[in-house]
Amino acid sequence: LLFSTFKGSGYDIACCDVNHPIIYNKMGNSICINKANFNPPFIENLFLIYLGKKQNTQTSIENYSKSQFNKVESIKKINRICDEFLKCNDLIHFEELIQEHESIISKAISINPIQKSTFIGYKDGKIKSLGSWGGDFILVTTKNKDLTYFRNRGLNTIIPLKEMVYLG
């Protein structure tokens, strides 16, 4: 029903049915869901920050569908990055992966990465857009766990990632 009406990936629905991190792959109308182990040694340096700018998911999907880019090559790169995310034991490398992922998605949807457009002054780590890019939450890395930069911008809902996700 989802694929024929909303055209979404189904990822959010898949997440509702599990109590652990997953790797989600969609090829046409086929989906593959695998359990993922994600509990890096730098988990204390990862935070979710609520932006309160819910995006229209349907509009985002329509814009993505119209975009012109090498989808096959981009998917290969993103799959490699995802594999590296799961194996990553170093915050600096994790941040490099975030930047690479943001760059690929930015080109695909013709939107600047949020760190370059909205949070250009943030220098203590990297920022990863989540969901429909620029909506409800961002993932933030920080080397010294000081998130004053975001609080000074009125973003006070800051949740340590380890409190929000099941790390099992």
Identify the meaning behind each predicted range.
Residues L2-K7, Y11-S132, L139-G168:
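C-terminal nucleotide
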